């Protein structure tokens, strides 16, 4: 029993160490993204913009979807900027041309995967803003999800004996898992994750937003 317990402890420690190692690779992009979403979109509630447009006759679903589209556009910009900066730094500091070692299909698939993951993250962040409607609280909740969401879900997987069947759909950690040379295989998963986030988080919280008082 002691041997089994030590093995479980070491495996858990390895998962935690690997998580924090990869976390700091995607953190510089994802954290500014959720801060932007939390602050920018909560301004509409604070300044009365939401109430103004709804009273003008704009449907709540149209308003909510328009904000999601803005969030997706910003997410794509964040990812592309980070991607190009990374290529440029590799070229300048390490003399690496960047993408000569792989095929065009892998490069395109990688770009689509990463874009979909970032868009899924912004969907979650914006949905929470519309649920909470407070910039500070939204930032805190989104930051906690970035820091500890994967660990909580992986702990749940371990308790239920599900392997990685839950965390494979955690878009935030998948941002760093996807490799360019295997991006084609990851693309279906990225598509499923994006639409799942849009339906689950966007659909449920959008429905709540539709029924809530906005005064």
What does each model-identified segment do?
Residues 1-40, 64-133, 142, 150-151, ...:
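Secretory targeting signals
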Residues 52-53, 63, 137-139:
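Alpha-helical transmembrane segments and their helix-entry boundary regions
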Residues 48-49, 123, 139-140:
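Transmembrane alpha-helix boundary/hinge residues in polytopic small-molecule transporters
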Residues 196-215:
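Junction motif at the cytosolic side of a transmembrane helix
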Residues 62-64, 209:
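Alpha-helix N-cap/helix-start motif at helix boundaries, enriched for small hydrophobics
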Residues 59, 133-135:
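Short loop-to-helix capping motifs
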Residues 37-56, 60, 68:
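Transmembrane helix boundary and interhelical loop/hinge segments in multi-pass membrane proteins
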Residues 135-169:
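Transmembrane helix segments
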């Amino acid at each position: 029993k002691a041997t089994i317990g030590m093995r479980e402890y070491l495996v858990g420690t390895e998962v935690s160490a690997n998580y924090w190692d990869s976390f700091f690779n995607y953190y510089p992009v994802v954290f500014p993204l959720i801060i932007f979403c939390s602050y920018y979109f909560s301004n509409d509630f604070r300044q009365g913009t939401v109430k103004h447009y709804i009273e003008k006759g704009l449907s709540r679903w149209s308003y909510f979807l328009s904000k999601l589209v803005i969030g997706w556009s910003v997410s794509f910009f964040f990812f592309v900027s980070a991607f190009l900066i990374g290529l440029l730094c590799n070229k300048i500091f390490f003399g690496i041309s960047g993408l000569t070692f792989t095929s065009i299909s892998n490069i395109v698939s990688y770009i689509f995967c990463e874009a979909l993951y970032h868009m899924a993250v912004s969907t979650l962040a914006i949905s929470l803003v519309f649920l909470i409607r407070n910039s500070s609280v939204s930032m805190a909740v989104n930051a906690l999800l970035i820091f500890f969401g994967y660990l909580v879900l992986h702990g749940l997987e371990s308790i239920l004996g599900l392997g990685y069947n839950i965390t494979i759909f955690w878009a935030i950690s998948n941002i760093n898992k996807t490799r360019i040379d295997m991006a084609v295989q990851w693309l279906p998963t990225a598509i499923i994750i994006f639409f799942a986030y849009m339906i689950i988080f966007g659909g449920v919280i959008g429905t709540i937003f539709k029924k809530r008082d906005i005064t």
